[in-house]
Amino acid sequence: MGGGNGGFGYEIPPEALTDERFANMIREAEKYLGYPYVWGGASPSTSFDCSGFVSWVINNCGNGWNVGRQTADGLRSCCAYVPPEQAKPGDLIFFQGTYDTPGASHVGIYVGNQVMIHCGDPIQYANISTPYWQQHFMAFGRLP
C-alpha cells in the first residue's frame, strides 16, 4: 500500500500514510507514475494533463469526493486556503504563470517534505523548493 516510488525517486514517509485520506490519494496517484503528459487528458486511457490527473485522483481515490473534471483554477476554487506552514500531505498545491492563463495554471498533490506528485512529463515526483516552482508558487489548498 502506498509508499512505493515506482522507481521515480521519492519514498512517502510511513508516518504520512497514517492519514487515511492521504494514503488513499497516494495509492491512486502512484498508479500513474510515468504516464506521459497529454494536454486535455483526464483518464488512464488518454493519459493526463496536470488538472486531469489531480481531478482523476480526487474522484477515484475512495474518499467520497467528486469534483468532476476541473481546471487547475477550478480545483483551487474547490479548496480552502492553507498557509504554507500548515500544508500537509494530501493538500493540493497551485502555481501561476507556468503558461499564459489567468489564475492557477498548474496543480499537484503535496506529499510533504517539499515534494509534490504532479503531471509534468511524465507524471512524477518533483521538489517544490527549486527556483522554478518557487517563482510560480501560488497557494496550498485543502479539500473539505
Located regions from the model:
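Intrinsically disordered, low-complexity
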Residues: M1-P36, E85, Q135-P144
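Catalytic cysteine-centered active-site loop
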Residues: Y35-P89
